[in-house]
UniProtKB/Swiss-Prot annotation:
Keywords: Ribonucleoprotein, Ribosomal protein. GO terms for cellular component: cytosolic large ribosomal subunit. This is Large ribosomal subunit protein uL30. Part of the 50S ribosomal subunit. HAMAP family: Ribosomal_uL30_B. It comes from Methylorubrum populi (strain ATCC BAA-705 / NCIMB 13946 / BJ001). One of its GO terms (molecular function) is structural constituent of ribosome. GO terms for biological process: translation. SUPFAM superfamilies: Ribosomal protein L30p/L7e. Disulfide bonds: none annotated. Belongs to the universal ribosomal protein uL30 family.
Length: 64
């Protein structure tokens, strides 16, 4: 059974953001603008995306 994944792209800079937001971007495997990361769709990843929603964009919501 294939696990669901979510693709996200960084669209905002972490400059002048709180350290926790910078750490969240690193946890999402993002570090530069317009980089795309594909992660397993879990509640913890969704929470991290919600925390930095102003800095990222979800590209594919449901990919199996």
């Amino acid at each position: 059974m294939a696990t669901k994944t979510v693709r996200i792209e960084q669209i905002g800079s972490p400059i002048r953001r709180e350290a926790s937001q910078r750490a969240t971007l690193i946890g999402l495997k993002l570090n530069k603008l317009h980089r795309v990361s594909e992660l397993e769709d879990t509640p913890s990843v969704r929470g991290m995306i919600r925390k930095v929603a102003h800095l990222v964009r979800v590209l594919d919501d449901a990919a199996a």
